[in-house]
UniProtKB/Swiss-Prot annotation:
Subcellular localization, as worded in the UniProt entry: Plastid, Chloroplast thylakoid membrane
GO cellular component: chloroplast thylakoid membrane; photosystem I reaction center
The protein's name: Photosystem I reaction center subunit IV
Membrane protein topology class: Peripheral membrane protein
Single GO BP term: photosynthesis
One Pfam short name: PSI_PsaE
Cited PANTHER family: PHOTOSYSTEM I REACTION CENTER SUBUNIT IV A, CHLOROPLASTIC-RELATED, PHOTOSYSTEM I SUBUNIT IV
Listed NCBIfam families: PRK02749.1
Principal cellular location given in the protein's record: plastid
Record keyword Transmembrane helix present: no
Record's function text: Stabilizes the interaction between PsaC and the PSI core, assists the docking of the ferredoxin to PSI and interacts with ferredoxin-NADP oxidoreductase.
Gene3D superfamilies given in the database record: 2.30.30.50
Keywords (A to Z) from UniProt: Chloroplast, Membrane, Photosynthesis, Photosystem I, Plastid, Thylakoid
Length: 64
């Protein structure tokens, strides 16, 4: 189960961060469509370093 502080790899192909690893900032349990907020080291073209994903668009990884 993905929880706050977990390292996750992004599986959404159209995402700027596709196949990148980020840290989960929060997981919303209220039933919204994209409940997982992920924070990245790298910023996108518009200067953003966070994005929302659904639970099936992220996979937890064990990076040291």
């Amino acid at each position: 189960m993905v929880k706050r502080g977990s390292k996750v790899r992004i599986l959404r192909k159209e995402s700027y961060w596709y196949q990148e690893v980020g840290t989960v900032a929060t997981v919303d349990t209220s039933g919204i469509r994209y409940p997982v907020v992920v924070r990245f080291e790298k910023v996108s073209y518009s200067g953003v370093n966070t994005n929302n994903f659904s639970l099936d668009e992220v996979i937890e990884v064990n990076e040291k």
